[in-house]
Design a protein with these regions (language model features):
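Conserved catalytic or regulatory cores that recognize and/or transform ribose-phosphate-containing ligands
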Residues: 1-179
């Protein structure tokens, strides 16, 4: 069975110690869900950067922010898939992770539960952007982990109408698979 590594990118620093859970709860949910999928193809490993270094520790485990950056970017470079939560669309760390994944041709799946007006590059660097964690997780399971064929009603997926490239047509059912 092959290993499949997924890195969870998204804002962390803006939430601080008082709101650390906002940067971590979605990651814990995704990690638990993805690692418990029953797939015969892969052993799924999900990287939550908060598991190694986080901003809520009273005594930080890291000596410098460079150490944190190097570890996180190394994890991105060795991932098979990156999931980015646009919970802080201005996070420089998240944008660096997104750009490196895109440059290395690592697929990036986005989540934007607030349906913000994302920068066009943020949109274009993602294969898909969803407005729901659960829809995104279903897609990752079907498309990347099990390769099952499923029908998806596309009006449930996030579509940024200001984007010049329409990822999803507005009024039909789309069939996706990755054969």
């Amino acid at each position: 069975m092959q290993d499949f590594q997924i890195y969870l990118a998204g804002g962390m620093g803006k939430f601080g110690k008082d709101r650390f859970f906002e940067s971590n709860n979605w990651r814990k949910y995704c990690k638990t869900t993805l690692e418990n999928y029953d797939t015969n193809r892969y052993k799924v490993h999900v990287i939550n950067p908060n598991d190694y270094f986080n901003f809520a520790d009273e005594t930080p485990r890291y000596a410098s922010h460079k150490e944190v950056m190097e570890l996180d970017l190394n994890r991105v470079r060795h991932s098979d898939l990156v999931i980015i939560n646009f919970n802080d669309m201005y996070s420089l760390g998240s944008m660096a992770e997104l750009a490196i994944a895109y440059d290395r041709r690592i697929p990036v799946i986005g989540v934007d539960t607030s349906e913000q007006n994302l920068h066009p590059w943020q949109i274009e660097m993602c294969q898909r952007i969803f407005n729901s964690l659960d829809l995104m997780l279903d897609y990752v399971e079907d498309y990347y982990l099990t390769w099952e064929r499923r029908w998806v009603k596309n009006n449930r997926m996030y579509y940024n109408k200001s984007s010049t490239s329409k990822r999803i047509a507005e009024s039909s059912w789309w069939f996706y698979n990755c054969y």
